[in-house]
């Protein structure tokens, strides 16, 4: 089985900014939409608990960035920017700061875009190498947030928050997701069709981070250095970057694959995940038990 966020399997799921092209500006109140209606007409490309309001889950989609009110179950698009948002990632030290990539509605690639106001407005930071890039995988280093990784024609790295980029190395075969370390600026994790890998040499040399060669549909590193990954046949696992055994948090999601994972930075026991079935699951015990959002 070939697993990729671009595959048919997953298709149902994929600070002042200075001078730049502003893609959109917020224009006040917008219509609210039940989560079920939003998910029926789009698919998810990323999740983040709002660092400015932990009562909201931010959902990057094929049609812009939306905020889910966790009390009401209603969503609202945060700006007029309704383009396909790939590689969505929250800044680990600047609440309200985000990076994304993807495709504009008119076609082509976005390059790297950024928001510093919670997603209300976006500015283009860079075309990347051989761009405009379309980073389907992107992550900000928790060890040094000025370092950003992306994958487009190989792994690219920025050392200045996404403004300039260099081509670093070929991506591992069958790459599905990447996650930057919270311990070392040189360390990068790769979820692939043949297992979970780690490089401590700026993506130039790779070793297995988990012994199985089963597909891994996502990998995420928390600010405290805890790695989370979903491994086919094993479920949701976690382990500290500093070592120790892998802990199986939840083995059986029936026919679901977890594509994206977000934990509340204030309360890490509260977590959210998106599946290939186009649904959002929520946990209040650090990932040991899950329920579909809105079914309480």
What does each model-identified segment do?
Residues 1-19, 23:
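N-terminal secretory signal peptides and thylakoid transit peptides that target proteins
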Residues 34-35, 63-82, 109-127, 156-168, ...:
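Asp-box/BNR beta-propeller loop motif
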Residues 36-66:
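Beta-strand-rich domains and repeat architectures in extracellular enzymes and scaffolds
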Residues 51-53, 92-95, 142-144, 182-184, ...:
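Residue-level detector of Asp-centered blade-edge/turn motifs that repeat once per structural unit
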Residues 81-86, 129-133, 171-176, 212-217, ...:
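Short coil/turn segments at the loop-to-beta-strand junctions that recur within blades
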Residues 104-109, 150, 231:
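Short, solvent-exposed loop/turn segments at conserved positions within beta-propeller repeat blades
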